[in-house]
């Protein structure tokens, strides 16, 4: 099963007649795809961020034969000015790269990633001249505690770093409004189990640490934090659950629940939202967030061939 999860590798099997009478041979064939990717468009952004966004991604699968993956993505408003322009023509732009590498043959996987993003809201907020710039980096280790065809339990540990600056040029020059820098340790366990339906549970604990972070004591007379009571050494728990079951050949029922429980006042990047395609889809993505948030979504999907 672990071989079937090797980057870019697709396995297929068939039974053949054996050499001896009554014997059977299991033949396994493998196909490796070096590069894959895709392009997607949606309208999940707020009106201030241009509503539409486009994303392009590419994945290089095991170019050296070690099972590694190199992933890259770019996101912007899907127009020429949105991708190449400046100023108000670019309400959102982001890009990043991630590398993962399996260690040994028992499922241990390591990974690193880096991403930068910029948002510059227009619409009713354009006169405020707002802009937010974020940089983030992570290093992750994951290991399968249980890995079977109908059950998988994974443990992961992550060291993450985020730097976010919000500014305005309403006075003609860029002026910083807030500056957050957070380093966090995160530990999580995920369970996927398929019986009558398929259940997914993901629980994560996050703890902010002082290394390479910016606290209220570091502010002084300089740029404030995004929240005066926000802590860089925070603690919070996050839970996400999914359940999907086929009620009929073309009818599927899905449940998504989850939320975040915080023990401290959080800065912007650590707050949790309840909007999105798998949560409250009737609202603009990211429009509702806070230190603590909980949501429940039930959905019926009916497949109809046209």
Residue locations for each model-derived region?
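Periplasmic polypeptide-binding modules associated with outer-membrane biogenesis and secretion
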Residues: 1-45, 74-89, 93, 257
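Flexible, solvent-exposed coil segments and beta strand-coil junctions
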Residues: 5, 32-39, 66-73, 115-123, ...
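Outer-envelope beta-barrel architecture signal
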Residues: 9, 24, 33-37, 52-54, ...
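Transmembrane beta-barrel strands of outer-membrane/channel proteins
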Residues: 15, 39-43, 70-76, 112-116, ...
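Membrane-embedded beta-strands of outer-membrane beta-barrel proteins
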Residues: 26, 56-58, 97-99, 139-141, ...
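Sequence/structural signature of outer-membrane beta-barrel proteins
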Residues: 44-48, 75-83, 117-125, 148, ...
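Transmembrane beta-barrel wall of Gram-negative outer-membrane proteins
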Residues: 83-191
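C-terminal outer-membrane beta-barrel translocator/porin domains of Gram-negative envelope proteins
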Residues: 165-306
């Amino acid at each position: 099963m672990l071989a079937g999860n090797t980057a870019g590798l697709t396995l297929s099997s068939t039974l053949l007649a054996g050499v001896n009478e009554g014997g059977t041979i299991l033949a396994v064939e493998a196909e490796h795809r070096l590069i894959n990717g895709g392009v997607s468009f949606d309208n999940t952004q707020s009106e201030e961020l241009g509503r539409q966004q486009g994303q392009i991604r590419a994945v290089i699968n095991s170019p050296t034969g070690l099972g590694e993956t190199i992933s890259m993505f770019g996101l912007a408003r899907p127009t020429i000015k949105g991708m190449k322009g400046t100023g108000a023509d670019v309400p959102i732009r982001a890009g990043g790269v991630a590398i993962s590498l399996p260690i040994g043959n028992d499922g241990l996987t390591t990974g690193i990633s880096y991403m930068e993003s910029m948002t510059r809201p227009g619409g009713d907020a354009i006169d405020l001249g707002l802009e937010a710039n974020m940089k983030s980096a992570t290093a992750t280790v994951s290991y399968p505690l249980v890995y079977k065809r109908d059950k998988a339990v994974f443990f992961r540990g992550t060291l993450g770093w985020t730097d976010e600056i919000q500014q305005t040029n309403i006075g003609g020059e860029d002026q910083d409004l807030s500056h957050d820098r957070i380093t966090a340790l995160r530990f999580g366990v995920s369970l996927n189990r398929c019986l009558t339906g398929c259940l997914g549970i993901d629980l994560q604990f996050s703890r902010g640490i002082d290394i390479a972070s910016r606290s209220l004591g570091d502010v002084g007379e300089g740029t404030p934090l995004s929240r005066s009571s926000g802590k860089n050494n925070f603690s919070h728990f996050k839970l996400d659950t999914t359940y999907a079951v086929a009620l009929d050949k073309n009818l599927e029922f899905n449940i998504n629940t989850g939320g975040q429980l915080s023990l401290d006042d959080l800065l912007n990047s650590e707050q949790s939202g309840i909007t999105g395609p798998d949560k409250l889809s009737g609202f603009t993505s990211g429009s509702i967030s806070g230190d603590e948030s909980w949501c429940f979504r039930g959905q019926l999907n009916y497949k109809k061939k046209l």
